[in-house]
Amino acid sequence: MQTFTAVVPAAGRGSRMQANKPKQYLHLGDKTIIEHTLTRLLAHPQIEKIVVVIADDDHYFSSLPLANHPRIEVTLGGPERAISVLNGLSSVETDWVLVHDAARPCITQSDLDALMAAAELGEDGAILAVPVKDTMKRSDSQQRIEETVERGHLWHALTPQMFPTQQLADAIDAGLTQSIVLTDEASAMERAGFKPLLVAGRSDNIKVTRPEDLALAAFILQQQELE
């Protein structure tokens, strides 16, 4: 059975949440968001280790019950996501790595299964994604509609995103060297010439970004427990 390492970048501040602490440490029920996320990842038998990347002034993570879990390793991040992920990759020993947002606590085992199965299909990697359903508009700088964008081949990129470890590290390093803005790991791989596979995932794998997302994530977690 192939095994994977998960890298969870958790060094961000989450300013859009307008909270007094980083959003990953806000509570959903009796656990913080990041605890829900890590619990879901730890439950998968093919994930042998999780590397959690935190800010150098983080004083929250060490107080969590999961902080001393034998399959969790902590390392320090940087001023942007790509640097944090690259730092996390230095602790990965498996051939393949999954990178997952700390603020996506609703990831399911079935989505993890589907993504990992894609590792058998090639060396370009794969990401979870959902097809765009809404009508998409492109705006000008004044937020006026310029055109309607054909949605037939548009997808919302989610996480985890899964790639061969060394290829991803090289791609991120190259992007940072060229001062390219890397909004996710797939964008680094794309610029390096790879064509990652889109694996259709569940639309309830939401990222908690704004205050209103907290209630939605709590509801999704409750509903998933009933499945």
Swiss-Prot record:
The record marks R16, K23 as: Transition state stabilizer. GO terms for molecular function: 2-C-methyl-D-erythritol 4-phosphate cytidylyltransferase activity. Its EC number is 2.7.7.60. It catalyses: 2-C-methyl-D-erythritol 4-phosphate + CTP + H(+) = 4-CDP-2-C-methyl-D-erythritol + diphosphate. Signal peptide: none annotated. InterPro entries: IspD, IspD/TarI, IspD/TarI_cytidylyltransf_bact, ISPD_synthase_CS, Nucleotide-diphossugar_trans. Keywords: Isoprene biosynthesis, Nucleotidyltransferase, Transferase. The keyword Nucleotidyltransferase applies. Pathway: Isoprenoid biosynthesis; isopentenyl diphosphate biosynthesis via DXP pathway; isopentenyl diphosphate from 1-deoxy-D-xylulose 5-phosphate: step 2/6. One of its GO terms (biological process) is isopentenyl diphosphate biosynthetic process, methylerythritol 4-phosphate pathway. PANTHER family: 2-C-METHYL-D-ERYTHRITOL 4-PHOSPHATE CYTIDYLYLTRANSFERASE, CHLOROPLASTIC. Belongs to the IspD/TarI cytidylyltransferase family. IspD subfamily. Catalyzes the formation of 4-diphosphocytidyl-2-C-methyl-D-erythritol from CTP and 2-C-methyl-D-erythritol 4-phosphate (MEP). NCBIfam families: ispD. HAMAP family: IspD (MF_00108). This is 2-C-methyl-D-erythritol 4-phosphate cytidylyltransferase. It comes from Tolumonas auensis (strain DSM 9187 / NBRC 110442 / TA 4). The lineage of its organism: Bacteria, Pseudomonadati, Pseudomonadota, Gammaproteobacteria, Aeromonadales.
